[in-house]
Amino acid sequence: MFISISAGIVTFLLTLVEIPAFIQFYRKAQITGQQMHEDVKQHQAKAGTPTMGGLVFLITSVLVAFFFALFSSQFSNNVGMILFILVLYGLVGFLDDFLKVFRKINEGLNPKQKLALQLLGGVIFYLFYERGGDILSVFGYPVHLGFFYIFFALFWLVGFSNAVNLTDGVDGLASISVVISLSAYGVIAYVQGQMDILLVILAMIGGLLGFFIFNHKPAKVFMGDVGSLALGGMLAAISMALHQEWTLLIIGIVYVFETTSVMMQVSYFKLTGGKRIFRMTPVHHHFELGGLSGKGNPWSEWKVDFFFWGVGLLASLLTLAILYLM
């Protein structure tokens, strides 16, 4: 436990030092910053804010977790595969950000390219991580999927990777939402005695907390796709490594809600010839523009943050209660 906590503290302190240096480099190099949604007027002032900050906490967390696990004899197959997903999905996000920022390609990687790379990572993860006989845990009950587990694994990894990416649209929202989710999985890992996975979790929590100091409103830096895609893949990988896949539907309710809002909006728009359910999706923008109903007073980014963080925290506590108190 001491090693895991130490990894988190080291990552936190390193990120505190590295992020300001990253921002300074970004400014001096006159790199074009984040582009903003035209429909959210209050975001226009953020245009040009340095992005790709996720590269800093991602590299730092992965290296700290790797070396701490290695030198404490806690490096396992599961740790290796979680770090692999972080690196590969982070690379996908980096390529996406790179094309947007340096090549001026607004959409970055096209959907097919992004999906292909995410699926590749999922296949490799499936082949090497300790699966326990391709058993899917559904509310604590084992379901033997056999070969079909690979399809679930791919759906889980790609789905939650993109879901966290959609959540990253308000200052600080994604970073603390993931901290809350990882904290819940940290408890599960501790109870299961999987200290190797706990080490990786605490290392990333440390990095995210250090990053949040510069990412809360008004954000001085954004994580970019390099951070959000990696974090979503990490959550999915951890849920599978702990054999508690179903828990991510509750622990990750914020990401599920954000993604579902986009799917509902697109489907309803097509079916009705242009009508909308929400003022704007992902749904955090709906709250920004008109509060909970979409027709009231706009919510500040802090209010949106605390609403979603509160939902995520309650969902995480509910999950732990279901697992250990019922």
From Swiss-Prot:
Keyword Transmembrane helix: yes
Pathway info: Cell wall biogenesis; peptidoglycan biosynthesis
Classification via InterPro entries: Glycosyl_transferase_4, PNAcMuramoyl-5peptid_Trfase, PNAcMuramoyl-5peptid_Trfase_CS
Keywords: Cell cycle, Cell division, Cell membrane, Cell shape, Cell wall biogenesis/degradation, Magnesium, Membrane, Metal-binding, Peptidoglycan synthesis, Transferase, Transmembrane, Transmembrane helix
MF (Gene Ontology): metal ion binding; phospho-N-acetylmuramoyl-pentapeptide-transferase activity
Gene Ontology BP terms: cell division; cell wall organization; peptidoglycan biosynthetic process; regulation of cell shape
Gene Ontology cellular-component annotations: plasma membrane
Locations listed in the record: Cell membrane
Residue intervals passing through the bilayer: 3-23, 51-71, 79-99, 115-135, 138-158, 169-189, 195-215, 221-243, 306-326
PANTHER family: PHOSPHO-N-ACETYLMURAMOYL-PENTAPEPTIDE-TRANSFERASE (PTHR22926), PHOSPHO-N-ACETYLMURAMOYL-PENTAPEPTIDE-TRANSFERASE HOMOLOG (PTHR22926:SF5)
Role this protein plays: Catalyzes the initial step of the lipid cycle reactions in the biosynthesis of the cell wall peptidoglycan: transfers peptidoglycan precursor phospho-MurNAc-pentapeptide from UDP-MurNAc-pentapeptide onto the lipid carrier undecaprenyl phosphate, yielding undecaprenyl-pyrophosphoryl-MurNAc-pentapeptide, known as lipid I.
Name used for this protein in its record: Phospho-N-acetylmuramoyl-pentapeptide-transferase
Organism: Streptococcus pneumoniae serotype 4 (strain ATCC BAA-334 / TIGR4)
Gene encoding the protein: mraY
